A protein has these predicted regions:
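Conserved protein kinase catalytic/activation segment
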Residues: 252-264
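ATP-dependent phospho-/nucleotidyl transfer catalytic cores
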Residues: 101-109, 117-122, 126, 158, ...
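Short, well-structured beta-strand/strand-turn elements
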Residues: 140-154
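Zn2+-dependent metallopeptidase catalytic core
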Residues: 36, 52-60, 129-143
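Compositionally biased P/S/T/G-rich terminal and signal peptide-adjacent segments
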Residues: 79-111
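Short, solvent-exposed loop/turn elements at domain surfaces
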Residues: 18-24, 63-65, 80, 96-99, ...
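Regulatory N- and C-terminal appendages and interdomain linkers associated
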Residues: 1-74
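Extracellular structured ligand-interaction cores
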Residues: 7-9, 49-53, 68-70, 83-85, ...
């Protein structure tokens, strides 16, 4: 790299058609799509992945790793922004099932199935630091938080701006943070009730119980505490309130399908 940065540099190289083709490009508008933000129906709203070559350079300019991987546009409404987030996924069909590098030194594990180059979401046009700041402030509470590293992105050799490199919150993330769980035996649900893995039956049963029972009764409350980590939920609410998070649907919650597991 001729230009040295004081942070990590990620380079994504791919066939331009994979990005800009109106028919198949993941960054293109395509057709048809709604002509108002966030442009529902555009190509970047599709669940598409394209092959790419990834290079990851440390702050001193040295190459840490390079590999073939899959790239996709990441996020929800912020997909409509000019600077979009990217998911980078290691898969066997590209050569390796994992990124074998300690991308986030603060975590104890050193391999990842996927990572995210995040455009900072709703803070994209402002500090780009709010989400990272709250995550770092809450990391001693026991909440599962995404580690980060500041990074710059070059897309097919063109400078694409400042990003925050984050862990992907998937079953591999949960397994890395909770080695004791069986990651194939999980229910993972998003705040909009979208099921990422498993189903929502156990969660709905818990909600029905809460709605139909008096939680001022100690026995009823103890039952709820046996099904969800109440302290974990309180810590999450503290983060939401203190951080003035109005995008309250942007959450994932999970449990292992065992009798003793609690929703977190």
């Amino acid at each position: 790299l001729e230009t040295r940065n004081s942070m990590v540099t990620v380079c994504i190289s791919t066939n331009p058609e994979n990005l800009w083709s109106e028919e198949t490009g993941i960054y293109a508008m395509g057709h048809p799509y709604e002509d108002v933000y966030p442009f529902h129906g555009a190509n970047f709203w599709q669940d598409w992945e394209r092959p790419a070559y990834i290079e990851y350079y440390q702050e001193d300019g040295s190459l840490a790793f390079d590999m073939d991987a899959g790239i996709s546009i990441h996020g929800e409404y912020t997909q409509g922004l000019d600077q979009k987030s990217f998911g980078i996924d290691a898969r066997k069909k590209y050569g390796s099932e994992f990124i074998h590098y300690a991308v986030f030194p603060e975590k104890s594990y050193s391999h990842y199935q996927s990572i995210v180059l995040r455009n900072s979401g709703q803070d994209n046009g402002n500090t780009k630091l709010r989400d990272v700041l709250i995550s770092q402030l809450m990391k001693e509470t026991g909440l599962d938080y995404q580690a980060y590293r500041p990074a710059v992105l070059y897309l097919n050799g063109e400078y694409w701006g400042f990003y925050t490199l984050r862990e992907s919150t998937d079953k591999h993330f949960l397994k890395a943070n909770h080695p004791e769980i069986n990651m194939e035996n999980l229910d993972i649900i998003e705040g909009n009730w979208r099921v990422h893995q498993g189903d929502r039956l156990a969660y709905q049963e818990l909600l029905n119980y809460i709605k139909s029972h008096d939680l001022s009764d100690a026995a009823n409350y103890d039952y709820v505490k046996s099904k969800m980590d109440v302290d974990n939920f309180i810590d999450y609410q503290i983060a939401v309130i203190y951080g003035a998070n109005v995008d309250n649907g942007n959450i994932k919650f999970w449990h292992e399908r065992t009798e003793s597991s609690k929703w977190r």
